[in-house]
From Swiss-Prot:
InterPro entries: Alkaline_phosphatase_core_sf, DeoB, Metalloenzyme, Phosphopentomutase_DeoB_cap_sf. This is Phosphopentomutase. Mn(2+) 1 binds at D16, D330, H331. HAMAP family: Phosphopentomut. The keyword Protease does not apply. The lineage of its organism: Bacteria, Bacillati, Bacillota, Bacilli, Bacillales.
Length: 395
């Protein structure tokens, strides 16, 4: 690892679902007109995001309330998703150099009877639910029945996901996790090919149920080497914050830091800014998506964006001359769009280091994989087959 890197530490923030306007192929995904950031800003009469403004957010495209500064600090552009799909795993895998041409399977009418029957047989518990639903809504609807009968609540969403909810006093966590491992085994390959199985434990009484932080994701393993694998294999640190380790099924991770919220994620990111390491610190801020996007809550989403922006004041001054900060997203989830699903959008890209003498526009990126290619280029590890590094464009 005696390699001279341009930047010793790279900090990558994925603002989960913070899209910046419809992608060219949005119509194919029934997402014409989707615009996560733009619509939230309009709904609120403007967003107060002075730190993102300084970096150059409104230079990518104007966001109401976020002024265009004369000299943005960051290099800025937007990125197009090359893969088929608009889910978390597809977006994150592409960021690290994989392209998914065959989208993970989705189950808009619930899972096939034969899969549910096999899950019941293998776990010894009946299944209730088996439909697309909001996680909070389905535990309100079926939580009481679950507590009386011990049947597990299975549900899905517009994503490729099989979620299993259970009360922690009815189905102990170790049993719930074991059930999810069985579900993962059953849906790993065709004909089901589910991207993620998620344990969704909750507590409380009927009418006052609350999901706990003991969620656990069981993702498919990435089907090729990611940039994270290359970094780890070369002896660099890869610190995964939030659900990053779950998304990549722990592939290429040297240290995993769990989080309970966006703000906890920012706390953990700030902690890593104080650590002495060479490599990547990679955080996913899931609340934008899980708490506000899917629930179509533009007010809450806007509040969360402003809270995130305020926390950048803890991040920017701690960056050293040989640090690089990359802020982006994995897909859109426009809270004023129809339905409750993700939206096919461009995502913002802001790239900053204290050594920059001001930012400039970068060309629009044709794939999220340009981020992974740039990180690989910086640490001089094998680059992924997809993606073009923009490292040389950062003066």
């Amino acid at each position: 690892m005696n390699v001279k890197t341009t930047y010793r530490r790279v900090f990558l923030i994925v603002m989960d679902s913070v899209g910046i306007g419809e992608a060219p192929d949005a119509e194919k995904y029934n997402d014409k007109g989707a615009d996560t950031l733009g619509h939230i800003a309009e709904y609120r009469g403007g967003l107060y995001m002075p730190n993102m403004a300084k970096l150059g957010l409104s230079h990518i495209r104007e966001i109401k309330g976020v002024p265009k500064v004369e000299r943005p600090l960051a290099y800025y552009t937007k990125m197009k998703e090359a893969s088929a799909g608009k889910d978390t795993m597809t977006g994150h895998w592409e960021l690290m150099g994989l392209r998914i041409d065959k989208p993970f399977r989705v189950f808009p009418n619930g899972f096939p009877d034969e899969l549910i029957a096999e899950l019941e047989r293998r776990t010894g518990r009946n299944v209730i639910g088996n439909k697309p639903a909001s996680g909070t809504a389905i535990i309100e609807e079926l939580g009481e029945e679950h507590m009386k009968t011990g049947a597990i609540i299975v549900y899905t969403s517009a994503d490729s996901v099989l979620q299993i909810a259970a009360h922690e006093q009815v189905v102990p966590l170790d049993e719930l996790y074991r059930i999810c491992e069985i579900a993962r085994e059953l849906t790993r390959d065709e004909p089901y090919m589910v991207g993620r199985v998620i344990a969704r434990p909750f507590i409380g009484k009927p009418g006052h149920f609350e999901r706990t932080a003991n969620r656990h994701d069981y993702a498919l393993k990435p089907f090729g080497k990611t940039v994270m694998n290359e970094l780890k294999d070369a002896g660099y640190e890869v610190i995964a914050i939030g659900k990053i380790a779950d998304i990549y099924d722990n592939e290429g991770v040297t240290q995993s830091l769990r989080t309970t919220s966006n703000m906890d994620g920012m706390d953990k990111l700030v902690d890593t800014l104080g650590m002495d390491f060479t490599g990547l610190s990679f955080v996913n801020l899931v609340d934008f998506d899980a708490k506000y996007g899917h629930r179509r809550d533009p007010k809450g989403y806007g509040d969360a964006l402003e809270e995130f922006d305020a926390r950048l004041a803890d991040v920017l001054p701690r960056l050293k001359e040989d640090d690089l900060l990359i802020i982006t997203a994995d897909h859109g989830n426009d809270p004023v769009h129809h339905g409750t699903d993700h939206t096919r959008e461009y995502v913002p890209l802001l790239v900053y280091s204290p050594r920059f003498r001001g930012g400039k526009p970068l060309p629009v990126r044709e794939t999220f994989a340009d981020v992974g290619a740039t990180i690989a280029d910086n640490f001089q590890v094998n680059r992924p087959p997809y993606g073009t590094s923009f490292l040389a464009d950062l003066a």
